[in-house]
């Protein structure tokens, strides 16, 4: 793989899920990689082991003699000292999505987009292709134990990428197969209206070449709405009977889901996946549709998906015991994702009391979706709301917005036993009382709530 005369790449925010995947791919492809991040941890340690020079914190001196600087949407280029230093030196500065687009030129690209389910669907496709002997190159915005990380450098013709719609990043990619797994209002800081979001997904679909294909889930009303704007071949999947590829007879047992699939009204095969929930059936259908488009044998699709073992922070079971609780950690941070996770927990473990522990992510999202979060959480037996994780936002810009808005919305939606804890230590102390048999604690959020799930799992392990 060559990028002109580029030998050294510096990555600002190298510890982020998407950025670390690019760094890993570049390292495994023979490039020199340097990078910086405000914090260090497991991800940056792994990159260092692979040969990257990683700096903690941002400094002009970190840029060095690199050939290009890459940054993510989370970085503000107008104020970041490394980006300003690179521009002063005349070093090209590009966003993550532009680098991804360049890396895709060397492969036949499969890009998975959608407001929900991207990470899991991408990992399912990757697992299926690896099991089929296709040796794909893979980049995912999450950690897969099967893949031993978020990136795989293969020698086959396919490159499978999670395509992010935030900041219209996915429009820089060059897919041969474009998957649209879901679509609803999201990222109000990028898309002022739902029409803008729809138009972006239509542009993404039409970015495939004339010989390519769009694969989309028609169970989502907004997806059904945009297909009329496609000018490329497309096929549909879903639980809806109008779909070309349809799942039926869905059965959820603990951490497994079983279902049958029909293709063009004829039975295709029966499938099993080692993750719970109807939302994961959608993800699996997308992978099956991709495999069919590639011409893979049906038996390879069945065995490939059976090998999928889930993703970290996607309904990840951190602790389980018949003599104690089940503790689950999930990345859900949108109302639809929260609702899907709660339903999966209730369907898989009907005998257990489900305690939904939710940390809102972003003040703006909390303000926009507080009511919807309340309805999504109301299916749990108990609800605990943590303080908002601000991420890129300044709390001072959002007076009056707190997690209590979500707690009150859950009460209005009919949830019982709703509590709000601004302080994480108080939340942990409260939850410790529920580390008993018959309970399932479902931690949800894209922030540091995952740390409390880990501490609860450690508490239960030490006590057992």
Swiss-Prot record:
Superkingdom of origin organism: Bacteria
Primary site of residence: cytoplasm
GO biological process, one term: cell wall organization
Subcellular location(s) per record: Cytoplasm
Alphabetical keyword list: ATP-binding, Cell cycle, Cell division, Cell shape, Cell wall biogenesis/degradation, Cytoplasm, Ligase, Nucleotide-binding, Peptidoglycan synthesis
Pathway: Cell wall biogenesis; peptidoglycan biosynthesis
SUPFAM superfamilies linked to this entry: MurCD N-terminal domain, MurD-like peptide ligases, catalytic domain, MurD-like peptide ligases, peptide-binding domain
SS bond partners: none
Molecular function terms, GO-annotated: ATP binding; UDP-N-acetylmuramate-L-alanine ligase activity
Pfam families, A to Z: Mur_ligase, Mur_ligase_C, Mur_ligase_M
GO cellular component: cytoplasm
Reactions it catalyzes: UDP-N-acetyl-alpha-D-muramate + L-alanine + ATP = UDP-N-acetyl-alpha-D-muramoyl-L-alanine + ADP + phosphate + H(+)
EC class name: ligase
ATP-binding recorded as keyword: yes
Keyword Lyase: no
Chain positions recorded as ATP binding sites: 114-120
EC nos: 6.3.2.8
Chain's role: Cell wall formation.
NCBIfam families: murC
The family this protein is said to belong to: Belongs to the MurCDEF family.
Protein name: UDP-N-acetylmuramate--L-alanine ligase
Species assigned in the record: Prosthecochloris aestuarii (strain DSM 271 / SK 413)
């Amino acid at each position: 793989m060559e990028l002109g005369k580029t030998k050294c790449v510096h990555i600002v925010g190298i510890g982020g899920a998407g950025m670390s995947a690019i760094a890993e791919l570049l390292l495994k492809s023979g490039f020199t990689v340097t990078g910086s991040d405000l914090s260090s941890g497991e991800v940056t340690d792994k990159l260092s082991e692979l040969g990257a020079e990683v700096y903690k914190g941002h400094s002009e001196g970190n840029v060095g003699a690199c050939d290009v600087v890459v940054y993510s949407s989370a970085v503000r280029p107008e104020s970041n000292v490394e980006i300003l230093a690179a521009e002063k030196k005349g070093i090209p500065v590009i966003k993550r999505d532009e680098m991804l687009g360049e890396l895709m030129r060397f492969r036949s690209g499969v890009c998975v987009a959608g407001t929900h389910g991207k990470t899991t669907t991408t990992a399912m496709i990757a697992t299926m292709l690896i099991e089929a002997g296709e040796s794909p190159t893979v980049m995912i915005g999450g950690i897969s134990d099967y893949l031993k990380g978020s990136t795989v450098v293969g020698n086959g013709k396919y490159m499978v990428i999670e395509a992010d719609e935030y900041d219209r990043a996915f429009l820089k990619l060059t897919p041969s197969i474009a998957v649209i797994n879901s679509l609803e209002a999201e990222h109000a800081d990028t898309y002022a209206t739902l029409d803008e979001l729809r138009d972006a997904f239509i542009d993404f679909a039409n970015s495939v070449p004339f010989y390519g294909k769009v694969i989309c889930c028609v169970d989502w009303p907004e997806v059904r709405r945009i297909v009329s704007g496609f000018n490329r071949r497309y096929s549909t999947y879903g639980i809806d009977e109008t779909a070309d590829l349809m799942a039926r007879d869905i059965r959820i047992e603990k951490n497994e889901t079983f279902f049958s699939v029909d293709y063009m009204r004829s039975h295709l095969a029966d499938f099993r996946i080692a993750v719970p929930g109807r939302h994961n059936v959608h993800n699996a259908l997308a992978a099956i549709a991709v495999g069919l488009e590639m011409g893979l044998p049906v038996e390879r699709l069945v065995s490939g998906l059976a090998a999928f073992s889930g993703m970290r922070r996607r309904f990840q079971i951190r602790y389980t015991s018949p003599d104690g609780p089940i503790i689950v950690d999930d990345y859900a941070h949108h109302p639809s994702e929260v609702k899907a996770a709660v339903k999966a927990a209730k369907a898989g473990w009907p005998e257990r009391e489900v305690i939904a522990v939710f940390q809102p992510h972003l003040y703006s999202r909390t303000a926009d979706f507080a009511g919807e979060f309340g309805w999504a959480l109301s299916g749990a037996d108990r609800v605990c709301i943590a303080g908002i994780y601000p991420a890129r936002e300044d709390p001072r810009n959002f007076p009056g917005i707190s997690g209590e808005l979500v707690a009150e919305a859950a009460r209005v939606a009919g949830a019982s036993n709703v509590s709000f804890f601004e302080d994480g230590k108080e939340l942990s102390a409260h939850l410790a009382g529920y580390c008993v048999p018959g309970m399932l604690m479902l931690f949800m959020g894209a922030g540091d709530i995952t740390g409390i799930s880990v501490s609860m799992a450690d508490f239960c392990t030490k006590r057992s």
